[in-house]
Amino acid sequence: MALYAIGDLHLSLGTNKPMDVFGPKWANYVEHIQENFSRLHDDDVTVIAGDISWGMSLEQSLPDFQFIDALPGKKLLLKGNHDYWWGTASKMEKFFAEHEITTLDILYNNAFFYGDHAICGTRGW
């Protein structure tokens, strides 16, 4: 079991806002994310520290959540300043349950226990 952190995925699988407009370093970045996550195991935990999806609503962000959900391990989501889709924790948990998204948890004014450690999340910007 290992703990990882990444931020600023800026996924746009449900919107037309590709990141490669910001330069060639962003070309095929979704494939690179998938390739690097393939090294993880199902008992690993990844903190995704905000700016997850360019979607403006939960529905518009659904393809991004499904992509992340399909990656190995548990993912803890923190709110970023571009995550306009972010609602209340209960609304998001209900949305995830309705769409059978099972590996994503919200980390916002709560804690997730990882072994002997607690991972806490709140807005820091």
Residues covered by each model-derived region:
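A polyampholytic, Gly/Pro-enriched intrinsically disordered region
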Residues: 98, 124-125
